[in-house]
Amino acid sequence: MREAEIRNYKKLNELADQSGIVIFGCGEDKNIPTCELRQAFAVESKVYNRSLDHISVIDAAGLYGEIVAQIAPETVLLHIGEEDKDFFTENPTEFDNKYRELIGIIKAQNRKCRIAVVSLKNYDNDPQLEELNKHLKYIAESEQCEYGDIANKKVWNPKTTRDAVSFVYSIGFAHPLKINRPLYDLVKIMFCYNA
């Protein structure tokens, strides 16, 4: 199954424009409706979802090279770690090293690439996920990346945000969410639209 998805992403990459925003995550991230969200929130940049089921931080660097590097994204939203709870518990240092390796590969490909490390959802206050998210935050800070905290349900109303973006658009600002906007806005839009 994964090989078919990888082949599909490679074919899509041949059609994709260089740069833009890439979501590189696992599990439910595959189903993020990027087209609808891009339209609803007037995100001007191209948004590509290159998420796969069961991505571990152990194989993320290789998969990034296979299915994302060809696009040469200007922004990467990393949402990796869901499959690594046991690995993290057994060896948190190795987890951190693998995540740093992934970030290093992204930066080597494009030094100006903006990277957001997105936390894992922890709506049930699982102490293991809380600790993993602390490590993700530390990794983001130490690697000079943004940290997108989506661990807890937040009071965020997508409709209100969409209406505000629409208003800004209507009064003459033609590019309300260009690539240089805060990454946290993109994280909220892409990962919290259904929270």
Regions found by a protein language model. Give the residues of each.
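Alpha-helical cap/lid subdomain in secreted, periplasmic
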Residues: 39-46, 62-195
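Serine-esterase "nucleophile elbow" of acetyl-processing enzymes
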Residues: 1-53, 58, 63-70
